[in-house]
């Protein structure tokens, strides 16, 4: 008598959602107009609104992404 064969499940990797690169402006409240960039050579993060020309700059490290720069800008706006 033989053993029953066991079906092996094939591991299908889950797709990771992409991080957003365009955000809402905390100054003029337009949607998808803020673009955040991180200059790793300068160790600075920049956020610029294309409608109201508002801008923000902050210090960055090697792990900083665009969402980190945007959240720092929103935190700075909430403090005022």
From Swiss-Prot:
Gene Ontology molecular function: RNA polymerase II complex binding; zinc ion binding
InterPro entries reported in the protein's UniProt record: Elf1 (IPR007808), T_Elf1_sf (IPR038567)
Alphabetized Pfam families for the sequence: Zn_ribbon_Elf1
Alphabetic keyword roster: Metal-binding, Nucleus, Transcription, Transcription regulation, Zinc, Zinc-finger
GO cellular component: transcription elongation factor complex
GO biological process: transcription elongation by RNA polymerase II
Location of this chain's protein in the cell: Nucleus
Origin superkingdom: Eukaryota
SUPFAM superfamilies with a match to the protein in the record: Zinc beta-ribbon (SSF57783)
Entry annotated with the keyword Transferase: no
Binding site for Zn(2+): 25, 28, 49, 52
Family: Belongs to the ELOF1 family.
Described function: Transcription elongation factor implicated in the maintenance of proper chromatin structure in actively transcribed regions.
Protein name: Transcription elongation factor 1 homolog
Species of the source: Encephalitozoon cuniculi (strain GB-M1)
Lineage: Eukaryota, Fungi, Fungi incertae sedis, Microsporidia, Unikaryonidae
């Amino acid at each position: 008598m033989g053993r029953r064969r066991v079906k092996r499940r094939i591991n299908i990797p889950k797709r990771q959602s992409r991080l957003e690169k365009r955000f809402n402006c905390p100054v003029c409240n337009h949607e998808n107009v803020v673009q955040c960039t991180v200059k790793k050579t300068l160790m600075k993060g920049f956020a610029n609104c294309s409608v109201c020309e508002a801008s923000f700059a902050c210090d960055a490290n090697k792990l900083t992404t665009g969402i980190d720069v945007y959240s720092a800008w929103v935190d700075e706006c909430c403090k005022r």
